[in-house]
From Swiss-Prot:
PANTHER family: GLUCAGON, PRO-GLUCAGON. It holds the Pfam family Hormone_2. The keyword Secreted applies. It comes from the Eukaryota. This is Glucagon. GO terms for biological process: adenylate cyclase-modulating G protein-coupled receptor signaling pathway; negative regulation of apoptotic process; positive regulation of insulin secretion involved in cellular response to glucose stimulus; protein kinase A signaling. It comes from Torpedo marmorata (Marbled electric ray). The gene is gcg. Promotes hydrolysis of glycogen and lipids, and raises the blood sugar level. It is found in: Secreted. Signal peptide: none annotated. InterPro entries: Glucagon (IPR015550), Glucagon_GIP_secretin_VIP (IPR000532).
Length: 29
């Protein structure tokens, strides 16, 4: 199902973004 693939890809993308934001936050602290 293409919807499920999109959802999992999207959550992976969000996880990556959150991880990068978290690293940036750590660097700035």
């Amino acid at each position: 199902h293409s919807e499920g693939t999109f959802t999992s890809d999207y959550s992976k993308y969000l996880d990556n973004r959150r991880a990068k934001d978290f690293v940036q936050w750590l660097m700035n602290t």
